[in-house]
Amino acid sequence: MPELPEVETVRRGLAPAMEGARVRKLHLGRPDLRFPFPADFAGLIEGKTIISLGRRAKYLLIELEDGLTIVSHLGMSGSFRIEAEKGEGGEAPGAFHYARSKDGKHDHVVFHLDKGEERVCVIYNDPRRFGFMHLVERNKLDLYPAFAELGPEPTGNALSADYLASRFEGKSQPLKSTLLDQKIIAGLGNIYVCEALWRAHLSPLRAAGTLVTTRGKPKAQLIDLTEKIRDVIADAIAAGGSSLRDHIQTDGTLGYFQHSFSVYDQEGQPCRTPGCGGTVERVVQAGRSTFYCAACQK
């Protein structure tokens, strides 16, 4: 499932084609994805101009001029691609035009857009149909069930060591499962938690509360972890995300941060920490694979 860097990569790729474009037609290939489309979904969107593309955690936000926002989740296999309208010459805005790379029978949503002199299609493809699109009033986004209790973004100023100390204090739960709690940090997933903990030399099995002093202040290790979380997310976004299973960027290319994985999916490989000499291990926590080096992550 795409994590925050993958969704941010998609947002950045779609923005040149979608922002400022008018939705001439919205084609739905079926009545539902994971959930049914909202009633009169196409009718509520056609004729509207897209004013901006945003993101909250792992959700893409397509904001329309009339105060409605399309909340889109990619699910397990969803992806967007951008193509010039059939019969039109030239490339789509942002130079993201490319030949079809996915089976057309899984093209479930097609935005036919007018942007200046250009006509472009933005196509949502989802073989497993685990993604979804909802319509939400922009001024009620904070009340949307998936957003109501989300923690701060790992890329924003709200994420600080002091904040994490306030959430970790007294917690006996393992550090990894605590970081995966979307109520604490929004958008962090399995891959990037494993990588951040390795960079901070912290065991995913360690109790989260041990990183907080008896006075409720962050220990030096928690200050460092906060920085490492920011760093790993920034590095992944710069690399275009990680192309595991079905994720592709909007220009059809694959992200390449997976080539920089230090521990994730590296079971049995030598630890990359200089001078460590340990081996990456895999354990299962709450039904999910955790990768770490027991020799240097304490």
From Swiss-Prot:
What this protein is called in its record is Formamidopyrimidine-DNA glycosylase
Sorted alphabetically, which HAMAP family does this protein's record hold?
A: Fapy_DNA_glycosyl
**Entry's Pfam families?**
Fapy_DNA_glyco, H2TH, zf-FPG_IleRS
EC number from the UniProt entry:
3.2.2.23, 4.2.99.18
Which keywords belong to this entry? DNA damage, DNA repair, DNA-binding, Glycosidase, Hydrolase, Lyase, Metal-binding, Multifunctional enzyme, Zinc, Zinc-finger
Which cysteines form disulfides? none
Assembly with partners or alone: Monomer.
Which cofactors are required for activity?
Answer: Zn(2+)
**What is catalysed by this protein?**
Hydrolysis of DNA containing ring-opened 7-methylguanine residues, releasing 2,6-diamino-4-hydroxy-5-(N-methyl)formamidopyrimidine; 2'-deoxyribonucleotide-(2'-deoxyribose 5'-phosphate)-2'-deoxyribonucleotide-DNA = a 3'-end 2'-deoxyribonucleotide-(2,3-dehydro-2,3-deoxyribose 5'-phosphate)-DNA + a 5'-end 5'-phospho-2'-deoxyribonucleoside-DNA + H(+)
Protein family: Belongs to the FPG family.
Q: Where are the zinc fingers (FPG-type)?
A: 262-298
**What does the entry's cofactor note say about binding and number?**
Binds 1 zinc ion per subunit.
The molecular function GO annotations come to: 8-oxo-7,8-dihydroguanine DNA N-glycosylase activity; class I DNA-(apurinic or apyrimidinic site) endonuclease activity; damaged DNA binding; zinc ion binding
**What's the domain of life for this entry?**
Bacteria
Where DNA binds, per the record, is at: 106, 128, 171
Annotated active site residues, numbered on this chain, are 2-3, 58, 288
For this protein, the record's InterPro entries field holds:
DNA_glyclase/AP_lyase_DNA-bd, DNA_glyclase_Znf_dom_DNA_BS, Formamido-pyr_DNA_Glyclase, FPG_cat, MutM-like_N-ter, Ribosomal_uS13-like_H2TH, Znf_DNA_glyclase/AP_lyase, Znf_FPG/IleRS
Functional note: Involved in base excision repair of DNA damaged by oxidation or by mutagenic agents. Acts as a DNA glycosylase that recognizes and removes damaged bases. Has a preference for oxidized purines, such as 7,8-dihydro-8-oxoguanine (8-oxoG). Has AP (apurinic/apyrimidinic) lyase activity and introduces nicks in the DNA strand. Cleaves the DNA backbone by beta-delta elimination to generate a single-strand break at the site of the removed base with both 3'- and 5'-phosphates.
